Structures are given as structure tokens and as C-alpha cells.
């Protein structure tokens, strides 16, 4: 028996070290299989959320799971588990959850890891001194009475010498009898770690905004706004965070959020992306039209109206502008945030009509043919903003003097012409918002609106600017922060997007004063409340957490027969989930 265990420890350590060395060389990414039933992967980011109370964000850890079953077996398991609920903070939106190992098997693997690192085990065929490997964390199936969902082991090193190991046990239960006494927790921590003083630190998270997933036919939105508060000391369990807390807003917004007021502007951006993709790839996937009339009819009516006018005066421009954006009026009235520009020029009004009605390349060619013919005949002399470098603007300016270049409407030219006027229009829309709200100056926005880069790059930057606008509008509508906070958020977003590609999954963090947001949380119940107990040895913790959704993405929980507890104060009743982290130190010498 002992020889078999020794050999298992040697083999497990050797395989972990091989993976560790390959990862350092950048050669290993996929999990490796150990003894047919276990898969192991070394990760440094994307750690399960429940472990982030223990690990630093960029800590490397070995993540141990059960091997994913073959397709046939997996489908059978999924059928059996179809009515179970397991909400994942790590992989929201995915249908396949990680597979957990039986608790007994997990303990065996933790034992092998600990045994291999023990310098007293000199009989093992492991080169001395033993190389310290990253922590090992094993997903557990919660089959024991305590509901263990994670087991972990982390080495204690002193001057690169392994001195011991910290063993972690993380449990999760769906339990109505979640009451816990703070003093009892402190007493247990003191006894476990033989200390006389304990520090308690509190944490609470409030969900300020989450999209309503009312339509099962579309993918759920990932828009969320939460408020995190932390404080010390903690006076009682489920304490409302005091005004002396450290607070931060966490904001993640998906463009096109239905409860925002930018649906029409977002559609214009989507149409812009369609044109850009068509130029880049040669394939154009047109959007469904907003208008019942054909694009050609729509543009012909527009030109006829202009042709009847002796001059294109301000009052007419305003009437045309209102007509062009009437389907967005309800959103504008609702928000009172975005003032529709009253100075749309000919090209911008043309964009509004064509972006809502064009459904084919032939539509583009016919519409631009009609426009160029009207310009050549002098039927219209449209008004334009200064500063545009679009091809259509150049042709219009030439038409003022009775001589226009001949432009063949073939290849990507029609796409490029419409893309250019769309870029001009959207840039002015965004500038109007940021400047009028005093959230950014033209200098701040120069990176996003500069015409000195390629058209494709301009599209990417405008897309970033739109995402910033979506973030701000969600906050203005539902959080109503003070102007100084909005300004700080704007500058933070601008700084991020000057250095990074578009990422709608990115969470923007904004430090805030609790007094400035107290109305958002003091009368509410948190979606997550946690207390962390520690002593002078900060690595040794006891953590108790209550949440209104399971933070474990690989287990289902038996729900006892009781009316489910409402933790978040909504009309919808939910089960409370209690997590408990305990740890113990084992010293090798």
C-alpha cells in the first residue's frame, strides 16, 4: 500500500512539474489527463470567482476537475441534470459546466500533492530540494455532509524552502437556517489557529442594474452594474456597510442594451459595421429595414422635397431632421439625456434614410445614381457642414461650380461613400453628447474622431466611443451619479480605450464615496455579504459568505422543502446560499 502511494505521489508531482515547466516556456495551454478520470490545467487568469477571496488575481494555480465525458455519456448526464441549477460567475451564459470529483478522490489528490512537497519524505524519488509548485485546487461534488465544493493546498515557503502547507476547505449549501453568530466565528477561528486576536473585514455587493432577460429568442444581455463596499471592523453579521467603507462601482455594459435609450443610434452603428465588413471581406450581411418603402422611393421623396425649395433654410432643415429621427423620439423623451441635433446636413439626413432602408448593393447603386444625377443637373444645391472629407461632400462642393468628377458606382465605391457619411454623422452625434454634458472636450476625443487613420480603424474607434456612451447613459438613467463621478468614469473609459481593443465584457471600476451613493444601498439588501476573519498571519482566513445565487459553477444543491428566502428584497423569492472557507496550517519541520 505504502509503495503504491509513494509511487503515486512521485508520478503526480512529476506530471505537475512538467506542466509547470512547459507553462513557463509558453508551450502548454491545454489540460492534461491524470489516471484517466482527472484533468489538470495550470491557469493564471479566469479563476473561479469563489477562489478570488483567497487568491491574487494573477496567481497561477493548478485547477483539477473530472475528465469531461464522451459525447454520448455527456448527453445522458445533461438530461439528468436539466432541471438542476448552477449559476456560474466564471462562465456566465455557457451551457456546459465543469465536472467535479468525488470528495474522497479530491482528498487523495491533495494528499499526494502535500506528500510530494514534504521535505521529510526523503525516500521519494523526487530531486531535492523539492521545487515548490503553484497551489492545487480541486473541484468537489459536495457529496459529503458538509457540502464541500473545493479543496485546496498552498505551500508555505521561507527563503525558497518549503516549510509547510495551508489546506483549504470550501463548502456551499442552500440553507434557510443560515443564521450565524459573529462571535462564534471568531472563537472558532481563534481555536483553530491558536491566536488571541482576530480582525474582521466585511464585504457587501449590491446589484444596482441587471438586464431583464424577458425574451428567450435573443441572447441575454451581459449588462450589470454593482456596488462593492468593504470595511473593518465588522460589528455584526449582515451589517449595513458604514459610510467609512471603501466603495467602488463595477460597470459592464453590452451595447444595444434594451433598457437604455440608444437603440436607434446602436442600429446606425451596426449598419456602419455592415458596410465596413462588406468592404473588408467582400460579403455584406444587410440588416432588416426599418422602413416599408424601398430605399429608392425613400431617397426620391427626399430629393423631391429638396427640389421644391428655393433654398435649404434652417426651418426646413429642422423639419427634415425631425422626420429622419422620429422613430427615436420616444427614447429621447424618456431619457432627456440625448438631445437630437438640430443641424443635420444633407449628407447626414441622407444617411438616416439610407441606413434604415437599404437592403442590397443594388439599392446603394440606384440611390447614389439618383443623387449624382440630381447634383449634375443642378436640381438641388444641398447644405453641408464644413470639414467633411467624404467623397460625396467633395462632389457636392464641385456641383456648386457646375463641374463634377465622374465617379463609377462599382466595386466597393458605393459602400465606401455611404460609410464615409455615416462616420461623419456618428462622430458629430457623439461629440455633441460628450461636449454638451461637459464630460469630455474635443481634445479628449481626438483619438476617437481623428480622420488621419484608415477608414477601418476609424470604424473601430467610433465603435469604442459608442460603447463609452452606452456605459454613461446606463449610469445616468439608473444610477444617477453626480457629475464629478460621471466625468471620472468618462475619463477612465477614454484612457482604457486609447490603449485597448473593444471589450464589452470589460468591467470598468469607479471608486466612489459611500456618502455619494448611500441612497442606492442603505435601504436595500445585498446580493452578496461576506465577512473575512484573519489574524497577523494574513494567509490564514475564515470566510463566511451569504449570496442570493450559487457562486459554485460545478455543483447543484439539494433545496430543502421550505419557502425560499428573499435575500435581494425583490418580489421574486430566492434560496440563500451559504459558503464557508476554513483552513489549517501543516508545518513540515
UniProtKB/Swiss-Prot annotation:
GO terms for biological process: cell division; mitotic spindle assembly checkpoint signaling; protein localization to kinetochore. It is found in: Chromosome, Centromere, Kinetochore. The modification Phosphoserine is found at residue 88. Signal peptide: none annotated. The keyword Phosphoprotein applies. Its main location: nucleus. GO terms for cellular component: kinetochore; RZZ complex. Keywords: Cell cycle, Cell division, Centromere, Chromosome, Kinetochore, Mitosis, Phosphoprotein. Pfam families: Zwilch. The keyword Cell division applies. Belongs to the ZWILCH family. Essential component of the mitotic checkpoint, which prevents cells from prematurely exiting mitosis. Required for the assembly of the dynein-dynactin and MAD1-MAD2 complexes onto kinetochores. Its function related to the spindle assembly machinery is proposed to depend on its association in the mitotic RZZ complex. Component of the RZZ complex composed of KNTC1/ROD, ZW10 and ZWILCH; in the complex interacts directly with KNTC1/ROD. This is Protein zwilch homolog. It comes from Mus musculus (Mouse). The lineage of its organism: Eukaryota, Metazoa, Chordata, Craniata, Vertebrata.
